[in-house]
Regions:
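Non-catalytic linker/capping segments at the edges of enzyme domains
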Residues: 1-53, 73, 78, 91-95, ...
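Short, structured beta-strand/loop micro-motifs enriched in basic residues and often containing a Trp
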Residues: 82-87, 117
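Compact, glycine-rich, soluble single-domain proteins
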Residues: 63-66
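Short nucleic-acid-contacting surface segments enriched for D/E, G, S/T with interspersed K/R
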Residues: 59, 94-102
Length: 167
C-alpha cells in the first residue's frame, strides 16, 4: 500500500542476504537471518588498513534492520528507526575469509499502537560467524513511525533536517 514506508536499506548498507525463519506468538517472536561474507566487502577496504575487520556497529545495524523488518512483517506501516539497545558485547570479529554471519533474534516484545500509527519491537540478539557466537545485543529497539520520511531528498523541506524527534 502507499502508506507502507518500511524498507531495508540498499547495499552496501544492507547487512542481510536472506531470512531463514520468522515467527510470532503473542507479543514475542523470532527472526533468524544470514549474510554471506565477501572478500571484497566495502568495509574491509577501509577498516582497518592492513588489518581488515567488519565494524561491530554494522552487526548491530543488521539486528536493527531485521527488527524493523519484523515490524513490517507484522503489519506496521511507516518508516523504521533504530531506537537504541541496552547492552552490546563484542567477543569476536568478522574477517574477510569467514563465510557466513548468522543473526538469531528473539523478539521479547512487539507492540502495535494504531492510534498513533506507531509500532515498537524489542529483541535480544546473538550474532554468529561460521557457527561461533561473537556478539550479544540486549534489548535492541526499533520503532516504525508515520509521517517522518524525507522523500524529497536532496531538496530542503519540512523533514530535511535531523535533531530530536518530537515526543
Amino acid at each position: 500500500p502507499p502508506e507502507f514506508k518500511a524498507r531495508f536499506p540498499l547495499p552496501p548498507m544492507l547487512m542481510v542476504d536472506r531470512i531463514d525463519h520468522i515467527s510470532r506468538e503473542g507479543v514475542r517472536g523470532r527472526i533468524v537471518a544470514e549474510r554471506d561474507i565477501r572478500l571484497d566487502d566495502w568495509f574491509f577496504q577501509c577498516h582497518f588498513l592492513e588489518d581488515p575487520v567488519q565494524p561491530g556497529c554494522l552487526g548491530v545495524d543488521g539486528v536493527w534492520q531485521l527488527i524493523g523488518f519484523y515490524c513490517a512483517w507484522n503489519g506496521a506501516l511507516g518508516t523504521g528507526r533504530a531506537l537504541g539497545c541496552s547492552e552490546v558485547d563484542f567477543f569476536g570479529q568478522i574477517r574477510p575469509h569467514d563465510k557466513v554471519v548468522r543473526y538469531e533474534i528473539d523478539i521479547v516484545r512487539y507492540q502495535d499502537l494504531p492510534q498513533s500509527g506507531t509500532a515498537i519491537a524489542i529483541g535480544d540478539a546473538d550474532i554468529l560467524v561460521d557457527g561461533d557466537s561473537i556478539y550479544k545485543i540486549k534489548r535492541a529497539k526499533v520503532g516504525v513511525f508515520r509521517d517522518i520520511d524525507y522523500n524529497d531528498y536532496p531538496w530542503p523541506s519540512q523533514r530535511s533536517r535531523g535533531g530530536k524527534m518530537a515526543e
